[in-house]
Amino acid sequence: MKLATLNNGKRDGALVVVSRDLSRAVRVPQLAATLQAALDEWAELAPKLTAVYQQLNDGACADAFPFDETACLSPLPRAYQWADGSAYVNHVELVRKARGAEMPESFWHDPLMYQGGSDSFLPPRGPIVMGSEE
């Protein structure tokens, strides 16, 4: 099943089900307005979303429209949090060294993780607004 978040002018976008070949999509407000809402009720909604996905792939959704990935936001434009388990030990070592802090031996074999800000994710194909160099 393929899901996406369509930019509808609201902060969290609108949930759409996308066809296997990425050519068509269908809105599913009767099931969940946003991807976060679908995830919150996943046990109940996953089978219903899967049924819509199958109907879409079978050409049985009259309200399907051409899918345009550039019209999408990030899947979860805002999230409660995100945690990344790919902290680089060499980077951690350099930062700690710059602060004059010892590098615990456990950092070389215990998993490292960091948490990032998640209040606003950029769309996958959206512009990155940069400040002027002037």
Name each model feature, range by range:
Residues 1-7, 11-12, 20-21, 29-30, ...:
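Active-site microenvironments in enzyme catalytic cores
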